[in-house]
């Protein structure tokens, strides 16, 4: 399993993501890596996605923004700052985050392992290769590409085929594109740190444990 960071480092990243967004809302300034940044986070270059969710009155959550960078072209700290700002202000599905929302949103940071192209000789081999609760997916075909984080199929209780189909649709392709010649499929893992509530304690998600609620083996 891909777990490069301990919980304290994960807490740092989540709080950094929130701080970056709050500072930009208030001053339009992009923060720099803080002086107390753990050195490991400045040395590693990993892809990072930030997810922002709104908490409803009934305690459920609703997506408010999710953007990131799957390939580690900068260090993890800079990638976290950049992805947090993009999720808050540049997600085309939503209006920019407002200062009045800061007390009702949760931040989640996903640190991605390097992408690995899946090697398979048949659709069945690919289905056996991709593990829900472990892998995220990137689908590429021609000029089209789509990415789904590992937590997405767990949250929706998708099986592997549905996960692959949805990744194709995310790339604006036919659901079955993953089984067609010429489509490139990449897998990766993610270490996911999340606030329990707005400004709350940070914990590391265990997708395998969360997946048990889906009872996919019983279907």
UniProtKB/Swiss-Prot annotation:
Q: Which SUPFAM superfamilies match?
A: AMMECR1-like
Q: Which PROSITE patterns match?
A: AMMECR1 (PS51112)
- Recorded protein name is Protein Cmaq_0360
Q: Which NCBIfam families match?
A: AmmeMemoSam_A, TIGR00296 family protein
Q: Which InterPro entries does this one have?
A: AMMECR1, AMMECR1_dom_sf, AMMECR1_domain, AMMECR1_N, AmmeMemoSam_A, Uncharacterised_MJ0810
What Pfam family is a match for this entry? AMMECR1
Per the database record, which ranges form the AMMECR1 domain? 8-204
Domain of life of the organism encoding this protein:
Archaea
Database matches in PANTHER family: AMME SYNDROME CANDIDATE GENE 1 PROTEIN, AMMECR1 HOMOLOG
